[in-house]
Amino acid sequence: MNYVTFNQDYSCLAVGTAKGFRIYHTEPFSKIFTGDNENVTIIEMLFSTSLVAIKQSPRHIVIQNTKRGTVICELTFPSAVLAVRLNRKRFAVLLEEEIYLYDIQNMGLLYTISTSANPNAICSLSASSDNCYLAYPLPKPREETGDKRPAHAPPLSPYVAPTSGEVLIFDAKSLKAVNVIEAHRAPLSCIALNNDGTLLATASETGTIIRVFSVPDGQKLYQFRRGTYPSSIFSLSFNMSSTLLCVSSNSDTIHIFRLGGPVTGLPESPQSPGDKDKWRRSRSFDSENGSPPAGISPGSEMADVPAEKSKSSGTFGSMIRRSSQMVGKGVAGVVGGYLPQAVTEMWEPARDFAFIKLPKGGMGVTPRSGPVKSVVAMSSSSPQVMVVTSDGGFYIYSIDMETGGEGVLVKQYSVLESDDSLEPPPINYVSYRT
């Protein structure tokens, strides 16, 4: 297997292999389509329609109608395609340092966004056509050093790798950046928008704290503790009603957090009449990343101390232009120009409501030799969690919505077939909104 993903409403599961791709219904589990395209390394569906996006070679994407067996269009890019995201309005293609945004109705190119290097394709496009938001790591502008480069040297990227976990919220309908959310002190490892495009879940490379923000205003609503020790987050997934958030990592435990309790977030700074057109930034830093100041408990968090406000904060109209370069420069100008008041939060992040322990042996006879990669989703019709693992297992667990606790394995299938291999190339296990 090369790739596996759920569609936007989790009703289908797509698997890419060296021999082609397969599409399954998740409830009840059954194979509904097989494609014979060779070496499919990315496949993404548009809900339960016959439209799929397929990557077979590094720089090439094919949009295909599986029902008619026809190719709708083919796209070639200047560098390797790392991920594809789509909804009923927009089609996004992620390269390492660019995002190409298309109108899915006619596949016309609408916008090109320059980004910091994003080798893990951290990006989420909401499934909603109304709240059509694209979230990705905030580009970090390269600082001018004054050093002269040789004339024959290739031009440097205007951005460098992020050193903190800030998320840029981009309106894919109006083609404007609308907010920056300071989610974590450490760089991001995974983000996910909910089905309605109103919530954003984030995790940093530390992997111990999961946060949920409102979109597009960026207010922090929930903070959850996944664990005490650092972990690599593989998948974040809201259920369809946005009352639960499921998290998988490089441990054998999958955590389910409940949303809908007391809303906890940062109070908003007082706004002047002109502040409505400025970037609003929600600051929420990982307490486990670095030593907390005196008087702050290990489980608490503290926002940065406010700095002197820059004179050149600007407005959305003056900062945001059609050019993606101007988006980056505008963001950079406002980052240093608008800081909220200092706030110290003394509340402990909430623990999981329920959890799942994956089988130690997986789908094989012998126990796994290392951590299993997984992608998770939640059923839209029952309190069940669906998990696909890197050894080809498809597991369905029942969750007690009253008491929580450990989920019960109720069904188990395999998405492997006799000619599939679990050997390299490495498998990309991503949820649709990651």
Swiss-Prot record:
Q: Where is the composition biased (Basic and acidic residues)?
A: 274-286
Question: Keyword Transport, does the record have it?
Answer: yes
Q: Which domain of life is it from?
A: Eukaryota
**Cystine connections:** none
Q: Where is it located?
A: Preautophagosomal structure membrane; Vacuole membrane; Endosome membrane
SUPFAM superfamilies, per database record = WD40 repeat-like
Membrane topology is:
Peripheral membrane protein
**Example of a GO biological process term:** protein transport
Q: Which Gene3D superfamilies match?
A: YVTN repeat-like/Quinoprotein amine dehydrogenase (2.130.10.10)
Q: Which ranges belong to the motif L/FRRG motif?
A: 224-228
Name of one Pfam family that matches = PROPPIN
* Each WD repeat, start to end: 1-34, 183-223, 228-267, 367-407
Family listed: Belongs to the WD repeat PROPPIN family.
**Quaternary assembly:** Component of the PI(3,5)P2 regulatory complex.
Show the domain comment: The N-terminus might form a beta-propeller domain involved in specific binding to phosphatidylinositol 3,5-bisphosphate (PIP2), leading to the association of the protein to the membrane.
Summarizing the function annotation, the protein's role is: The PI(3,5)P2 regulatory complex regulates both the synthesis and turnover of phosphatidylinositol 3,5-bisphosphate (PtdIns(3,5)P2). Necessary for proper vacuole morphology. Plays an important role in osmotically-induced vacuole fragmentation. Required for cytoplasm to vacuole transport (Cvt) vesicle formation, pexophagy and starvation-induced autophagy. Involved in correct atg9 trafficking to the pre-autophagosomal structure. Might also be involved in premeiotic DNA replication.
- Protein's name according to its UniProt entry: Autophagy-related protein 18
Q: Which organism is it from?
A: Botryotinia fuckeliana (strain B05.10)
The organism's lineage is: Eukaryota, Fungi, Dikarya, Ascomycota, Pezizomycotina
